[in-house]
């Protein structure tokens, strides 16, 4: 009986996370910038200067953002900045923050790739590395250090029990 209850609870939690992620990806994308240029033929759009993009519970800021469209909707967002930042409120109200010099977001897959000076903050834990991939739907991440030397390893800071954010 306990195993059955656990299995049901597990799948319910996964379903709720997926519904929240799908709801976010179905929201309208709002963009503010100093400059924009678009090709109606290809759907490619580039924004420059204090660019802010929001979609549901997701906010991205960068110096330059490119949006690639297919079949009438945005498929990927590529950001450059020193740094580019992302804030995402998860379904459990946890605020996830990310920053990197290069940030890309796959709208359909709900995955963020952070490259060059990448940092991810989630529920008090801080992850730093050369690159981090974060799946917003599954709430999973992978981090990689740089290839040059041992100085470029990943760093993981886990707060002590009782620290705010846990």
Short names for language-model regions:
Residues 1-166:
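Mature-chain termini and adjacent capping regions
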């Amino acid at each position: 009986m306990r195993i059955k209850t656990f299995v049901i609870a597990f799948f319910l939690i996964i379903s709720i996370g997926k519904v929240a992620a799908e709801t976010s990806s179905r929201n309208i994308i709002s963009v503010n910038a100093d400059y924009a240029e678009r090709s109606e033929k290809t759907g490619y759009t580039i924004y420059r200067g204090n660019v802010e993009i929001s979609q549901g519970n997701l906010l991205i800021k960068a110096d330059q953002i490119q949006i690639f469209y297919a079949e009438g909707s945005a498929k990927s967002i590529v950001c450059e900045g020193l740094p580019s930042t992302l804030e995402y409120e998860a379904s459990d109200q946890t605020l996830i923050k990310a920053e990197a010099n290069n940030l890309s977001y796959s709208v359909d897959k709900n995955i963020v790739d952070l490259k060059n000076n990448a940092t991810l903050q989630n529920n008090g834990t801080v992850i730093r590395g050369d690159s981090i991939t974060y799946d917003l739907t599954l709430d999973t991440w992978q981090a990689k250090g740089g290839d040059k030397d041992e100085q470029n390893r990943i760093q993981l800071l886990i707060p002590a029990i009782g620290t705010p954010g846990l």
